[in-house]
Amino acid sequence: MDERQIDKLLTEVARGNNAAFEVLYEKTKRGTFSFIYSYLKCYEDTEDVMQNVYLKIKLNIDKYTSGTNGRAWILQIAKNLALNELSKRKRVEYVDEVKTRAEEISCGSITEIMQKELSEEEYRIVTLHILWGYKHREIGEMMNCPTGTVTSKYKRSIKKLKQALKEAEQ
């Protein structure tokens, strides 16, 4: 889904169109989930944050400026809530339980292989490029790093994933 479509849906949501909100959710949920998961690495927590992201979108839609990058706005909300969740974990010393859950997750899906094989930064770059359609330049701006660095990390990540998938097939 391109940025204009997301912007149009957010504008409709601001006008009170609930059907537009449902379409927005359906079209953006996969990428948003993967983005949040890249921070939390726990399905249950990611699902909780996902609910909060879309609730926050609904409640704060009046703060969205029509004609801007709606995808970036959604991802910024997702990032903020994911980071809030991480800080809660630190306060509760939840780290050991998270490690246990992460070990229990099987490596059957692409997302799990990505999470296992790639660093957090590489995972975000691949997710933002493949699932969200961001250009390397845009990812560089979001992550405060040069476009060339994003491009080389992306290529290296894809090479790692190809190798991991070959090994998984054997």
What are these regions (language model features)?
Residues 34, 48-55, 59, 68-80:
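Structural recognition of an alpha-helix C-terminal capping motif at a helix-to-coil junction
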Residues 1-31, 116, 142-143, 167-170:
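N-terminal module of bacterial RNA polymerase sigma factors
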Residues 10, 83, 131, 137, ...:
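DNA-recognition helix of helix-turn-helix
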Residues 25, 117-138, 142, 167-168:
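Short amphipathic alpha helix immediately N-terminal
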Residues 3, 84, 88-116:
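Internal acidic/polar
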